[in-house]
Amino acid sequence: MRQSGASQPLLINMYLPDPVGDGLFKDGKNPSWGPLSPAVQKGSGQIQLWQFLLELLADRANAGCIAWEGGHGEFKLTDPDEVARRWGERKSKPNMNYDKLSRALRYYYDKNIMSKVHGKRYAYRFDFQGLAQACQPPPAHAHAAAAAAAAAAAAQDGALYKLPAGLAPLPFPGLSKLNLMAASAGVAPAGFSYWPGPGPAATAAAATAALYPSPSLQPPPGPFGAVAAASHLGGHYH
């Protein structure tokens, strides 16, 4: 014998806009559960299929296409084509039919939200306990852990794939020798590395300074270097 919607668990009131239809399930609402967000209020396209079905079931005027039957969350699509048409209208999908709608309903089987009533055509049953668990928001510590993991991943990605600001790859292979010479002089190497340091010109100058620490020991350029050196040494004997 078909039972009225009022005999269904009062848990349904969690998932329905307030007020709905003729006010079914209004009394006895669990205060720890809130109503649907404004985005899924009655008439909105931002609504899931299970919410849409509960919305239809809450209004006795829809008994011609869907109605509670048998208790314990069981309901029947008395006119499955009409239910599919209304669902397609709500979601702006004019090609919606019962075959597509039934495939969408099967998605809820693995989620423990709904099941098919065996031996009855177009009959389904809501699992309100599973539905309540599926709708529970994750705990606060889960949000914090997810944020920390995202920050760590972003930091690791930056360390592996990004060069520090102001550094550039080596312009030519010979500069690596200058980097080694500069390192022996206590100058941080530059170029293709993660160590901040002077540019290539400064590095070359530092390497030259390491080889010739005193300006007086710098060799003059060109072939006159030997003559200049001889005259410089000869000055000490006068």
From Swiss-Prot:
Entry-linked PROSITE patterns: ETS_DOMAIN_1, ETS_DOMAIN_2, ETS_DOMAIN_3
InterPro entries according to UniProt: Ets_dom, ETS_fam, WH-like_DNA-bd_sf, WH_DNA-bd_sf
PANTHER family associated with the record: ETS, PROTEIN FEV
Site feature location: Breakpoint for insertion to form EWS-FEV fusion protein: D18, P19
Keyword Chloroplast set for record: no
Protein name: Protein FEV
Keywords recorded for this protein, A-Z: Chromosomal rearrangement, Developmental protein, Differentiation, DNA-binding, Neurogenesis, Nucleus, Transcription, Transcription regulation
